[in-house]
Amino acid sequence: MSRIGKRPVTVPSGVTATVEGQTVKMKGPKGELRFVVHDDVEVKLEDGAVKVAPRYETKRAQALYGTARAQVANLVAGVTKGFEKKLEIIGVGYRAALQGKSLQLALGYSHDVNYAVPEGITIAVPKPTEITITGNDAQRVGQVAAEIRGYRPPEPYKGKGVKYADETIFRKEGKKK
């Protein structure tokens, strides 16, 4: 049994939650989100809280309902506070610039990398070596951050590349003569 799944997700004031079949919809100040819960998981809206329970006593249902509860909690957090990821660019000549709906990255290649900003995601570049990604969907914010980091992941010798702000790079020592 999942210990996380047992706890109901409270819906704060200012957020409206609806459950239609297996679809959970949340509407709040930061927008509207929906999540389709797996068929092995039962979802109910009771007393201003969303309750998640396994529909069957199978191992799969037990595994899925804790995940479903966490996803519903992310919906509530997304429509109230939103999510944010910060990236840092380290390296000589490495920089980022925002041009309209496109993020232009100079990452040491012979060409600049242009990344089209998806709908529902806001990208800010406070400094040429910092990128801030915000949005109300945790999965999409994380995916965009991972895609941008994937263009030039940090290398272990000098630490050059795009890294998460809270990430520590495991450094290696160079060859010895």
From Swiss-Prot:
Gene Ontology cellular-component annotations: cytosolic large ribosomal subunit
Family: Belongs to the universal ribosomal protein uL6 family.
Keyword annotations: Ribonucleoprotein, Ribosomal protein, RNA-binding, rRNA-binding
Gene that produces this protein: rplF
Residues making up the signal peptide according to the UniProt record: none
GO molecular function: rRNA binding; structural constituent of ribosome
GO-annotated biological processes: cytoplasmic translation
HAMAP family: Ribosomal_uL6_B
The protein, known as: Large ribosomal subunit protein uL6
SUPFAM superfamilies reported for this sequence: Ribosomal protein L6
InterPro entries from the UniProt entry: Ribosomal_uL6-like, Ribosomal_uL6-like_a/b-dom_sf, Ribosomal_uL6_a/b-dom, Ribosomal_uL6_bac-type, Ribosomal_uL6_CS
Protein's job: This protein binds to the 23S rRNA, and is important in its secondary structure. It is located near the subunit interface in the base of the L7/L12 stalk, and near the tRNA binding site of the peptidyltransferase center.
Subunit architecture: Part of the 50S ribosomal subunit.
